[in-house]
Protein backbone atom coordinates (compact mmCIF):
# COMPACT_ATOMS: atom_id res chain seq x y z
CA UNK A 1 0.00 0.00 0.00
CA UNK A 2 1.19 3.51 -0.77
CA UNK A 3 1.83 6.25 1.75
CA UNK A 4 -1.00 8.08 3.50
CA UNK A 5 0.48 11.14 1.79
CA UNK A 6 -0.83 9.68 -1.48
CA UNK A 7 -4.35 9.42 -0.03
CA UNK A 8 -4.87 12.89 1.43
CA UNK A 9 -4.02 15.71 -0.97
CA UNK A 10 -4.18 19.44 -0.33
CA UNK A 11 -5.05 21.77 -3.19
CA UNK A 12 -7.48 24.11 -4.89
CA UNK A 13 -11.00 22.91 -5.67
CA UNK A 14 -13.24 22.04 -7.33
CA UNK A 15 -11.50 19.39 -9.45
CA UNK A 16 -8.49 17.13 -8.95
CA UNK A 17 -7.81 17.15 -12.69
CA UNK A 18 -8.86 20.70 -13.60
CA UNK A 19 -7.57 22.69 -10.62
CA UNK A 20 -5.34 20.58 -8.34
CA UNK A 21 -3.30 19.16 -11.23
CA UNK A 22 -2.84 22.55 -12.95
CA UNK A 23 -1.99 24.13 -9.58
CA UNK A 24 0.72 21.53 -9.03
CA UNK A 25 2.04 21.96 -12.57
CA UNK A 26 2.14 25.76 -12.26
CA UNK A 27 3.93 25.53 -8.91
CA UNK A 28 6.56 23.24 -10.44
CA UNK A 29 7.05 25.44 -13.52
CA UNK A 30 7.28 28.64 -11.47
CA UNK A 31 9.95 27.05 -9.25
CA UNK A 32 11.93 26.10 -12.38
CA UNK A 33 11.74 29.69 -13.69
CA UNK A 34 12.19 32.07 -10.73
CA UNK A 35 13.49 34.87 -12.98
CA UNK A 36 10.55 34.87 -15.41
CA UNK A 37 8.71 38.18 -15.63
CA UNK A 38 5.65 36.76 -17.43
CA UNK A 39 4.03 33.43 -18.18
CA UNK A 40 1.77 31.97 -20.85
CA UNK A 41 -0.30 28.80 -20.50
CA UNK A 42 -2.14 27.06 -23.34
CA UNK A 43 -4.93 24.70 -22.28
CA UNK A 44 -6.10 21.88 -24.56
CA UNK A 45 -8.91 19.35 -24.66
CA UNK A 46 -11.11 19.13 -21.58
CA UNK A 47 -9.09 21.80 -19.78
CA UNK A 48 -9.87 24.20 -22.62
CA UNK A 49 -13.53 23.21 -22.91
CA UNK A 50 -14.42 23.39 -19.21
CA UNK A 51 -11.53 25.33 -17.70
CA UNK A 52 -13.47 28.56 -17.21
CA UNK A 53 -16.27 26.78 -15.35
CA UNK A 54 -13.78 24.98 -13.12
CA UNK A 55 -11.72 28.10 -12.52
CA UNK A 56 -8.56 26.61 -14.03
CA UNK A 57 -7.49 30.04 -15.27
CA UNK A 58 -8.03 31.64 -11.85
CA UNK A 59 -5.92 29.00 -10.11
CA UNK A 60 -3.11 29.28 -12.65
CA UNK A 61 -2.98 33.08 -12.37
CA UNK A 62 -2.99 32.87 -8.57
CA UNK A 63 -0.07 30.43 -8.49
CA UNK A 64 1.99 32.24 -11.14
CA UNK A 65 1.41 35.71 -9.66
CA UNK A 66 2.69 38.36 -9.33
CA UNK A 67 3.98 37.87 -12.87
CA UNK A 68 1.28 38.54 -15.49
CA UNK A 69 -0.06 35.33 -17.03
CA UNK A 70 -1.77 34.89 -20.40
CA UNK A 71 -4.19 31.95 -20.53
CA UNK A 72 -5.16 30.58 -23.95
CA UNK A 73 -8.07 28.15 -24.33
CA UNK A 74 -7.00 26.32 -27.47
CA UNK A 75 -9.36 24.39 -29.73
CA UNK A 76 -6.41 22.60 -31.32
CA UNK A 77 -6.36 18.82 -31.05
CA UNK A 78 -2.99 17.25 -30.36
CA UNK A 79 -2.98 13.67 -31.73
CA UNK A 80 -2.25 11.07 -29.07
CA UNK A 81 -2.20 13.56 -26.22
CA UNK A 82 -3.97 13.33 -22.88
CA UNK A 83 -7.29 15.26 -22.79
CA UNK A 84 -5.96 17.42 -19.93
CA UNK A 85 -2.81 18.78 -21.55
CA UNK A 86 -1.18 22.15 -20.81
CA UNK A 87 1.76 23.99 -22.36
CA UNK A 88 3.65 26.37 -20.05
CA UNK A 89 5.90 29.15 -21.32
CA UNK A 90 8.17 31.39 -19.25
CA UNK A 91 9.07 34.83 -20.61
CA UNK A 92 11.99 37.13 -19.77
CA UNK A 93 12.10 40.61 -21.29
CA UNK A 94 9.61 39.54 -23.94
CA UNK A 95 11.61 36.47 -24.99
CA UNK A 96 10.55 32.87 -24.33
CA UNK A 97 13.08 31.36 -21.91
CA UNK A 98 11.54 27.97 -21.10
CA UNK A 99 8.60 25.76 -22.01
CA UNK A 100 7.09 22.60 -20.57
CA UNK A 101 4.18 20.35 -21.54
CA UNK A 102 2.25 18.83 -18.65
CA UNK A 103 -0.66 16.40 -18.47
CA UNK A 104 -3.09 16.46 -15.55
CA UNK A 105 -3.84 12.75 -15.26
CA UNK A 106 -6.35 12.79 -12.39
CA UNK A 107 -6.28 12.64 -8.63
CA UNK A 108 -4.20 15.80 -8.51
CA UNK A 109 -1.29 14.00 -10.20
CA UNK A 110 0.61 15.29 -13.22
CA UNK A 111 2.83 13.76 -15.89
CA UNK A 112 5.49 15.36 -18.08
CA UNK A 113 5.60 13.61 -21.48
CA UNK A 114 9.03 12.23 -22.28
CA UNK A 115 9.96 11.96 -18.63
CA UNK A 116 9.82 8.64 -16.87
CA UNK A 117 7.03 8.60 -14.32
CA UNK A 118 8.30 8.30 -10.80
CA UNK A 119 6.61 5.28 -9.30
CA UNK A 120 4.97 6.00 -5.98
CA UNK A 121 6.81 4.04 -3.33
CA UNK A 122 5.00 1.15 -1.71
CA UNK A 123 5.36 2.10 1.95
CA UNK A 124 3.31 -0.75 3.41
CA UNK A 125 4.25 -4.28 2.31
CA UNK A 126 1.09 -5.82 3.78
CA UNK A 127 -1.85 -6.25 1.40
CA UNK A 128 -4.79 -6.82 3.76
CA UNK A 129 -5.88 -6.00 7.28
CA UNK A 130 -5.37 -9.67 8.22
CA UNK A 131 -1.71 -9.36 7.19
CA UNK A 132 -1.40 -6.11 9.16
CA UNK A 133 -2.91 -7.77 12.25
CA UNK A 134 -0.48 -10.70 11.99
CA UNK A 135 2.47 -8.32 11.57
CA UNK A 136 1.44 -6.23 14.58
CA UNK A 137 0.97 -9.33 16.72
CA UNK A 138 4.40 -10.64 15.76
CA UNK A 139 6.10 -7.26 16.46
CA UNK A 140 4.10 -6.56 19.66
CA UNK A 141 2.55 -3.46 18.09
CA UNK A 142 -0.61 -2.58 20.00
CA UNK A 143 -2.18 0.22 17.92
CA UNK A 144 -2.58 1.10 14.26
CA UNK A 145 -0.98 4.47 14.93
CA UNK A 146 2.21 2.69 16.04
CA UNK A 147 2.09 0.62 12.84
CA UNK A 148 1.68 3.76 10.72
CA UNK A 149 4.60 5.53 12.41
CA UNK A 150 6.82 2.47 11.99
CA UNK A 151 6.25 2.56 8.22
CA UNK A 152 5.90 6.30 7.58
CA UNK A 153 8.20 7.77 10.21
CA UNK A 154 7.23 10.26 12.95
CA UNK A 155 7.02 13.11 10.41
CA UNK A 156 3.73 11.65 9.15
CA UNK A 157 2.02 13.26 12.15
CA UNK A 158 3.13 16.73 11.03
CA UNK A 159 1.62 16.02 7.61
CA UNK A 160 -1.65 14.79 9.11
CA UNK A 161 -1.78 17.82 11.40
CA UNK A 162 -1.46 20.02 8.31
CA UNK A 163 -4.27 18.05 6.65
CA UNK A 164 -6.47 18.50 9.72
CA UNK A 165 -5.72 22.24 9.85
CA UNK A 166 -6.64 22.68 6.17
CA UNK A 167 -9.89 20.79 6.79
CA UNK A 168 -10.76 23.08 9.71
CA UNK A 169 -9.80 26.20 7.77
CA UNK A 170 -12.10 25.15 4.92
CA UNK A 171 -14.99 24.93 7.38
CA UNK A 172 -14.18 28.23 9.10
CA UNK A 173 -13.72 30.17 5.86
CA UNK A 174 -16.80 28.61 4.27
CA UNK A 175 -18.98 29.59 7.23
CA UNK A 176 -17.94 33.23 6.88
CA UNK A 177 -18.15 33.57 3.10
CA UNK A 178 -21.13 35.12 1.33
CA UNK A 179 -22.22 35.79 -2.22
CA UNK A 180 -22.55 33.85 -5.44
CA UNK A 181 -20.23 30.98 -6.28
CA UNK A 182 -18.13 31.28 -9.46
CA UNK A 183 -18.95 29.20 -12.51
CA UNK A 184 -21.83 31.13 -14.05
CA UNK A 185 -24.70 29.10 -12.53
CA UNK A 186 -25.67 31.86 -10.07
CA UNK A 187 -25.53 29.51 -7.05
CA UNK A 188 -25.78 31.38 -3.76
CA UNK A 189 -23.64 30.32 -0.80
CA UNK A 190 -25.72 28.81 2.02
CA UNK A 191 -23.31 27.79 4.80
CA UNK A 192 -23.27 31.17 6.60
CA UNK A 193 -27.07 31.36 6.51
CA UNK A 194 -27.38 27.84 7.92
CA UNK A 195 -24.96 28.35 10.81
CA UNK A 196 -26.58 31.65 11.80
CA UNK A 197 -30.22 30.52 11.49
CA UNK A 198 -32.14 29.38 14.55
CA UNK A 199 -34.70 26.59 14.08
CA UNK A 200 -38.17 27.15 15.50
CA UNK A 201 -37.78 24.10 17.73
CA UNK A 202 -34.47 24.07 19.57
CA UNK A 203 -34.22 20.31 19.78
CA UNK A 204 -30.60 19.26 20.44
CA UNK A 205 -30.65 16.67 17.67
CA UNK A 206 -31.95 19.22 15.15
CA UNK A 207 -29.37 21.81 16.23
CA UNK A 208 -26.61 19.25 15.79
CA UNK A 209 -27.94 18.23 12.37
CA UNK A 210 -28.09 21.87 11.29
CA UNK A 211 -24.48 22.42 12.35
CA UNK A 212 -23.33 19.31 10.47
CA UNK A 213 -25.20 20.48 7.37
CA UNK A 214 -23.63 23.94 7.64
CA UNK A 215 -20.15 22.44 7.90
CA UNK A 216 -20.80 20.22 4.88
CA UNK A 217 -22.04 23.18 2.84
CA UNK A 218 -19.05 25.26 3.98
CA UNK A 219 -16.51 22.76 2.66
CA UNK A 220 -18.47 22.08 -0.54
CA UNK A 221 -18.75 25.81 -1.24
CA UNK A 222 -15.07 26.41 -0.56
CA UNK A 223 -14.32 23.60 -2.99
CA UNK A 224 -16.62 25.11 -5.62
CA UNK A 225 -15.09 28.55 -5.07
CA UNK A 226 -11.48 27.45 -5.77
CA UNK A 227 -10.70 27.38 -2.07
CA UNK A 228 -7.97 25.20 -0.55
CA UNK A 229 -9.38 21.86 0.55
CA UNK A 230 -8.34 18.28 1.25
CA UNK A 231 -9.36 15.62 -1.23
CA UNK A 232 -9.18 11.85 -0.86
CA UNK A 233 -10.14 8.96 -3.15
Predicted region positions:
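Accessory "access/gating" subregions that flank catalytic or transport cores
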Residues: 162, 168-233
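Generic N-terminal amphipathic, Lys/Arg-enriched alpha-helix
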Residues: 2-14, 146-147
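Beta-strand segments within the central parallel beta-sheet cores of soluble alpha/beta enzyme folds
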Residues: 36-45
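Generic structural signal for well-ordered, non-membrane alpha-helical segments
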Residues: 15, 19-22, 26, 53-57, ...
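N-terminal glycine-rich anion-binding loops that anchor highly charged ligand groups
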Residues: 1-3, 33-37
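Conserved phosphate/anionic-ligand binding catalytic regions in large, soluble enzymes, centered on
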Residues: 8-28, 225-233
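Mobile "lid/hinge" segments at catalytic clefts and subdomain interfaces of large enzymes
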Residues: 44, 55-64, 68-92, 96-151, ...
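Buried hydrophobic packing segments
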Residues: 22-29, 60, 64, 216-219, ...
Amino acid sequence: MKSIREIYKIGKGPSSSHTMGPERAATLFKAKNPDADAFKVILYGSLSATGIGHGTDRVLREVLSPAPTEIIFSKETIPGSHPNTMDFFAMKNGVESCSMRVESIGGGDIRIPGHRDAESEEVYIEHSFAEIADFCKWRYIHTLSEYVELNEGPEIWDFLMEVWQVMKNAIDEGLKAEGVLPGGLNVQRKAKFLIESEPEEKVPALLEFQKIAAYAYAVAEQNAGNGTIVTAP
